Every structure is written in C-alpha cells, then in structure tokens.
Amino acid sequence: MTMWPLSCGGRGDPHTATVDEFRDEFAAALRAGWAGFAGVLVDEGEIAVPAPDGYRPHRLRAKLEYRGGPFGTVTVEVAPEEVGGLTRVEEIPARDAADWFAELGLPTPQPVPTLPLAHQIAQKLHACTTPDDRAWVNERAHDLVDLQLALRVYTGSLAEIRDVAVRLFTARGLHAWPPLVTARQGWKARYAAEAVGLDVLPTLEDAVIWANQLLAEINASEE
C-alpha cells in the first residue's frame, strides 16, 4: 500500500492540504475529468479505528467513468500528517503505469509522491499491535503481509524506523514502544487470504514470530 498523507496546513501546496480541502479539490478534479475519465466522489467519513482526535483516517470512494460509461470504483483513504512525515516526501516512478498509459494513448503519468517508507513501516507496526478495547477489535493481520513486502524494498536503516516509531507511538499515546504482535481470532484466515500469490511467510504463526523479531531488532538499533 502506498500512503500519501495530509498535513494540517492550507491551500497552495499539494502535500499540505487538510482532509476537507483534499476532498473538495479531489471532487472538483473528478468532475473536470482527465483524458476521457471523470467521476463522482462519495465521502464515507472517518474510519472507526483507535486514534487521537483529529488524526483518524478518512475514507472516500471515487466512482469513475470513461467516456460516459461506468469504469470502476477506487477507495481512497486519507489521514493528517504525523511526526514530520511530510518533511521529506518520497516519489515513486510510475514505470508499469507508463507502459500501460502509452498502449492506451494516455498522457505519461508523473511520479507518485508518497509517505516515506520508514513512516509507513512505523505506522503499520503501530496498527498491528494496537490493543483491543470494548468497542474495537484489532483485525490488522494484513499488516504482517505489508510489512514483509515493505522491508524487502526498504533501503534505510532500522534506526530510522525506530526514531519514527518512537515519536509516533508517543504522539498517539495508545500503547507503549516497543510493542509485541499478538494474533487475534480470525487473523489466521485473514493472513492466508492476503498472502495468496505473494512471496511471504506461509503461515500466520511464522509471520508473528518474524514481526516480533523485527521489532526487537528495530528497538535495539542505534544511529
């Protein structure tokens, strides 16, 4: 999963929009259309997950059409920037997409701005270790798949992940660093479904052991 966060800034910089501004500008862009595509934005509101007030992710669905006919629906989740995540935005070249666009006669896509991978990893470590409460059960088994794939392409240091993670856990204040991954009921089936066709550990048990070893290595790392 590629993440593009939002900060609490204002208009003028595409990387520093509020959730409301992003929604309004996204809806306007869909109405205006691009290369035969257009769409309508449906706002589904905040996602019910444990998070400090003002930092819960927001779910939008873009219902797309192409040249007047139905094309598909894309789910977009946005969240405010945390712990300096936008200080250094990373860009991913859209190489595969560029080939597809060329075959379809569409304009060449620009590089995709993303949340730095160290921040994405820290957020997923936080998400899959967040304790349950009376109103919410942690179902984030899929993060164990995402983490394996992310670590495979991550080129930074474990110390960088630790720095981000410590600040993130402190800012959110939901549970302490370092955490432990604990499997919940239903995780085994969810992990198996998410892992289909991917080069990741075959069982949930293996993935939990791997994730907790990773957490120990990150916590022991130093700059």
Label every PLM stretch briefly.
Residues 2-8, 13-223:
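Structured mid-to-C-terminal alpha-helical surface segments
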